[in-house]
Amino acid sequence: MKQRLYIDTSVFGGFFDEEFAEFTKPLFERLKNGEFELLFSAVTQDELSAAPERVRKLVTSLKAENTEFIETNNEAVELATNYIAEKVVGQTSFADCLHIAIATISRADYLISWNFKHIVNVQKIRGYNAINIKNGYRELEIRSPRDFMTYDDND
């Protein structure tokens, strides 16, 4: 069974960013090769609607058969609101909380992001997962694309 990856908006932008491309492009190659199942949410779609054309083309280049589209629902909104109510992050980070809630509810194996301030942050991850467990969900692994690099065994 393929691992289920929820990729937030920052990773799509990172593909074209000099600072992040080195680690983002190999992840997309692995996605295109069908190594993972991509979880793509309505939140990500909405955020990318204003992105440059090359970013939107990157989205459409991914294979539909390896992608699950996930709508935002009341359960996700409630969980995201809970993260804020419990002060894991502030009110201005609601969209980030929605990404985490959707990934959690959709049983993603990993949420992948380049957002180190609000998402890929040890203290924040602890907070999100404490609330997930308190609400009957499993913990969510939150990583950056760098954690998905493959290395030659001869190195």
What are these regions (language model features)?
Residues L39, I70, E141-R143:
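General small-molecule cofactor/ligand-binding pocket signal
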Residues M1-F40, D46-S61, T67, A85-Q91, ...:
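Short, well-structured N-terminal submotif of metal-dependent ribonuclease cores
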Residues K2, A21, Q45-D46, S106-D155:
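Acidic, PIN/NYN-like endoribonuclease modules and their adjacent C-terminal/linker elements
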